[in-house]
Swiss-Prot record:
The modification N-acetylmethionine is found at residue 1. Expressed at high levels in testis. Also expressed in prostate, thyroid and thymus. Residues 151-160 have a biased composition (Basic and acidic residues). Residues 425-522 form the REKLES domain. Residues 1-22, 529-559 have a biased composition (Low complexity). Disruption phenotype: Embryos die before 11.5 dpc and display various abnormalities, including wavy neural tube, small branchial arches and defects of cardiovascular system. Residues 201-374 are annotated as: Interaction with RB1. Heterodimer with ARID3A. Interacts with unphosphorylated RB1. Keywords: Acetylation, Developmental protein, DNA-binding, Methylation, Nucleus, Phosphoprotein, Transcription, Transcription regulation. This is AT-rich interactive domain-containing protein 3B. It is found in: Nucleus.
């Protein structure tokens, strides 16, 4: 019995102690739970306010910043520890507490668990969104007056604008530059664009104020409105030679001259440059003015005055390009203009005549004329046929190549001066053709023909005088590809200055001899028959060298062939 009584007494002594312990635990837990609930409610209440403060945030981002990830003072953990400590003696006592106490403790535990789960859920969300702004300092702290809270909120607003001084471990530090790059980068570009815009507006203002012409403002307004409606607005004023290009004056000058196409065809851009007061040292001023006019003013010209069409403009530009690539006519032949060609031809003929009369050889060859081998017809009967001069080849670009004097020339067997009197004077004929209204290309080709004809005559007149000075061989009608095998051939070789070794091949018979020069003008009398040759030899009064036939004659004997004489 005694042990039972002792147990009952102990239980009675412990029973008044248990309500005291429960009351102490409740008194300790009450303010802590209220504090945790107040903190959680304040967090939930600040969420819409933060969302309204940061409108640029995405909808799914968290509003709590990196500093909110650190639990403030962890009251929930302390309460759980105290509840565990307080529950240990209750479990040891065998659960003799009253039902009301158990219900209260269970409700408190459930609320604490819910608060803790929601708190840790918010912590996970903030970890997933690292760009959250540090707003934990905006949470109200119990124990502070409303004025203190307001001052603290003001400080936190200033702090939120400045970068955090000490970033938390594992959290990125967000500086002011990065925030400007992400959210305020447009402000910098707007400022730069604003500077350029102010510059452009100043250019427009200067364009309006270049002079006091009352039509300037009306024209510029109409031009800008037209280009805006056309879909190609003028966003900037062109600059030329470090000054604003006066669009009004450019349009006025061009339209007064007949329009853009007319100026391109006439090539009078220099007058436009002077009218705009631009320096004459500008390179490619014509091209620059043309491109600027086409870009800013040509459509307006077509709309208002219709001086030309885009097709005509393109044709004018293409023609200008072709003329730019084409070489000038003054340098195509002799380096001087075609108008002076007649005078040059006359000078060449006079030089040839003076050289022939004075006995001095003159090589009249233009350095840029191509000479063709002259073909000659065979002489038949007593009359000599006129020389056959092949038509001159057409003059093309690049034909003016210097040609050396050929060592073998085909010349006429009769005097060139005799045939020169039978046809009209080349200079008069050339002058008539130049004075006629022919295109320059045809004039150039005809000029080349006349020049070649004059030079051929000069060579015929000075044949033997050149042979005396130059060691050369001249073969007359000696082309191997001739269809007439009976054509006479003449080979001349200079042995010294005063004599010429001559070899004539007539109808297969070769005649050789030495010619001694006595007169500068050579009269070459050649007959097709031995009788004509003999008569010419008998009529000769001057001293002559008789040509003896070669032993390789294919017709007759040397004694049967009469001797031929050449009068010098």
């Amino acid at each position: 019995m005694e042990p039972l009584q002792q147990q009952q007494q102990q239980q009675q002594q412990k029973q008044p102690q248990q309500p005291l312990l429960q009351m102490d635990a409740r008194e300790k837990q009450g303010p802590q739970t209220r504090e945790s609930q107040f903190l959680y409610a304040s967090k939930l209440g600040t969420q819409p306010a933060l969302l309204s403060i940061t409108p640029g945030r995405p909808s799914g981002s968290s509003v709590l910043g990196p500093l909110a990830r650190v639990p403030p003072a962890t009251p929930v953990a302390r309460m759980s520890e105290q509840s565990n400590v307080n529950s240990e003696p209750e479990e040891e006592e065998g659960g003799l507490e009253d039902e009301d106490g158990d219900d209260d403790v269970a409700e408190v535990a459930e609320k604490e668990a819910q608060a803790a789960s929601k708190y840790f859920h918010m912590q996970k969300v903030t970890r997933q969104e690292p760009r959250a702004t540090p707003m934990s300092s905006l949470l109200p702290v119990p124990g502070l007056s409303p004025q203190g809270q307001q001052t603290k909120e003001d400080h936190t607003k200033d702090a939120s604008k400045a970068p955090p001084s000490v970033p938390t471990a594992g959290q990125p530090s967000w500086s002011l530059d990065e925030q400007l790059k992400q959210n305020g980068a447009l402000a910098w570009s707007d400022d730069a664009d604003g500077g350029r815009g102010r510059e452009i507006s100043r250019d427009f203002a200067k364009l309006y104020e270049l002079d006091g012409d009352p039509e300037r403002k009306e024209f510029l307004d109409d031009l800008f409105i037209f280009m805006q409606k056309r879909g190609t607005p003028i966003n900037r004023i062109p600059i030329m030679a470090k000054q604003i290009l006066d669009l009004y004056m450019l349009y006025k000058l061009v339209t007064e001259k007949g329009g853009l196409v007319e100026i391109i065809n006439k090539k009078i851009w220099r007058e436009i440059t002077k009218g705009l007061n631009l320096p004459t040292s500008i390179t490619s001023a014509a091209f620059t003015l043309r491109t600027q006019y086409m870009k800013y003013l040509y459509a307006y010209e077509c709309e208002k005055k219709a001086l030309s069409s885009p097709a005509e403009l393109q044709a004018a530009i293409d023609g200008n390009r072709r003329e730019g690539r084409r070489p000038s006519y003054s340098s195509s032949l002799f380096g001087y203009s075609p108008a002076a060609a007649a005078a040059a031809a006359a000078a060449a003929a006079a030089a040839a005549a003076s050289a022939a009369s004075a006995g001095t050889p003159a090589l009249l060859s233009s350095p840029k004329i191509r000479f063709s081998i002259l073909g000659l017809g065979s002489s038949s009967g007593t009359s000599a046929s006129s020389p056959r001069i092949p038509p001159a080849s057409t003059l093309r670009k690049g034909d003016g190549v210097p040609v050396p004097v050929p060592n073998r020339l085909a010349v006429s067997g009769t005097l060139a001066g005799q045939q020169a009197g039978n046809r009209p004077g080349p200079l008069e004929h050339l002058r008539e053709r130049l004075e006629s209204g022919e295109p320059p290309e045809k004039k150039a080709s005809r000029l080349s023909e006349e020049e070649q004809r004059l030079v051929q005559q000069a060579f015929q007149r000075n044949l033997f005088s050149m042979a005396r000075q130059l060691p050369m061989k001249i073969r007359i009608n000696g082309r191997e590809d001739r269809a007439e095998p009976s054509a006479p051939a003449l080979n001349l070789t200079t042995s010294n200055i005063g004599s010429i070794n001559m070899s004539v091949d007539i109808d297969g018979t070769t005649y050789t001899g030495v010619l001694f020069a006595q007169k500068p003008v050579v009269h070459l009398i050649a007959g097709s028959t031995p009788q004509s040759i003999g008569s010419s030899a008998s009529s000769s009064n001057s001293s002559s060298s008789h040509c003896s036939p070669s032993p390789t004659s294919s017709r007759g004997t040397p004694s049967a062939e009469p001797s031929t004489s050449w009068s010098l």
